[in-house]
């Protein structure tokens, strides 16, 4: 019931304040509510809604353990790196939601990631797999193509254009994406002392990256290329974009060894083989001052506080990469052959020989596909033309090019092959006409 005093003054039905004591009184059928009570109700409902949404978000966002388990399905080894990445990514996306939905005096800053590891150790693949799991837009950029504004090359904003394109120009979605910047070690300045000469592809690029790494409203040319004053720009906030920078940082292990007191030269030098002292073990002892000595500027180091180190892949790890992950190369080729009704088998010695070749070429996991293509070329050329091929066995001799793969023919093989491409095209033309 609406409240009235003797002078018929209207009062709020909830707090009892008169219309003179509040800014506004809203009337309903037999009831009144003041602006203060409306605001209080709104806050209560909003808090409850936020709590429900936060709980839902907590259920949706995988825990660090779940993230690592997913990475384990696709990436062999690198357990230490996967653990650090899992925690970092979880905290990053938890921070985004918390900031979006709650007013708080404590602002949690973004923590970008720096990955160090030899070529082919899985840096790019780890970042790609994370984006796949979280279903967020993902873009890869090559730091060596970037130059600072005013010089020939790509502006740093073009990195963001790739992310926007991968998000189908949904800016809000792109603003929660992941950007992987490869070859970041190649933009180290030539010396750890500032130089009076201009370093447009080194220190200059590091300086240009600072703003987007930290968080800024960036103006991105929609067609890419250089900015000019008369074109329209896409505005994107980089505050919640996770940047993962990766590089081999060749030679940084010597800087680390010098710092921790290991002798690398001289008569009394401690001599250890690479097997005894793995580069990965040395890299784990990295400190910010080592990156500074390498040529990264202090401001850049400060914006990538999480450092992840990866181990070089040994023979055993490379064999596992060939066979164990969900999308392992051996499984991919077996599926390709199965499409033509052919079974594909790799002998154990053949897999070992493939791993040895990758180590010899110093290409890590990245070089495995190229080696496989070389081995399989002739067989893949013949199979589509011969319906009687039942099985192919890849031997060590085939990998070393001392012999051809073993091809087993079955004259009685019955194959229900899909219509040839030419036939299917003719059928499609007939249907259209």
UniProtKB/Swiss-Prot annotation:
Ubl conjugation as UniProt keyword: no
Pfam families, alphabetized: AAA_2, ClpB_D2-small, zf-C4_ClpX
Job of this protein: ATP-dependent specificity component of the Clp protease. It directs the protease to specific substrates. Can perform chaperone functions in the absence of ClpP.
Entry's family note: Belongs to the ClpX chaperone family.
Residues where ATP binds: 118-125
InterPro entries the UniProt entry points to: AAA+_ATPase (IPR003593), ATP-dep_Clp_protease_ClpX (IPR050052), ATPase_AAA_core (IPR003959), Clp_ATPase_C (IPR019489), Clp_protease_ATP-bd_su_ClpX (IPR004487), ClpX_bact (IPR046425), P-loop_NTPase (IPR027417), Znf_CppX_C4 (IPR010603)
SMART domains: AAA (SM00382), ClpB_D2-small (SM01086), zf-C4_ClpX (SM00994)
Keyword terms of this UniProt record: ATP-binding, Chaperone, Metal-binding, Nucleotide-binding, Zinc
Lineage: Bacteria, Bacillati, Bacillota, Bacillota incertae sedis, Caldicellulosiruptorales
GO molecular function, one term: zinc ion binding
Cellular component GO terms held in the UniProt record: HslUV protease complex
Subunit field text: Component of the ClpX-ClpP complex. Forms a hexameric ring that, in the presence of ATP, binds to fourteen ClpP subunits assembled into a disk-like structure with a central cavity, resembling the structure of eukaryotic proteasomes.
GO biological process, one term: cell division
Sites where the protein binds Zn(2+): 12, 15, 34, 37
NCBIfam families: clpX, PRK05342.1
Provenance organism: Caldicellulosiruptor saccharolyticus (strain ATCC 43494 / DSM 8903 / Tp8T 6331)
Domain ClpX-type ZB span(s) in chain numbering: 1-53
Keyword DNA repair: no
Gene3D superfamilies in the cross-refs: 1.10.8.60, ClpX chaperone, C4-type zinc finger domain, P-loop containing nucleotide triphosphate hydrolases
Protein name listed in UniProt: ATP-dependent Clp protease ATP-binding subunit ClpX
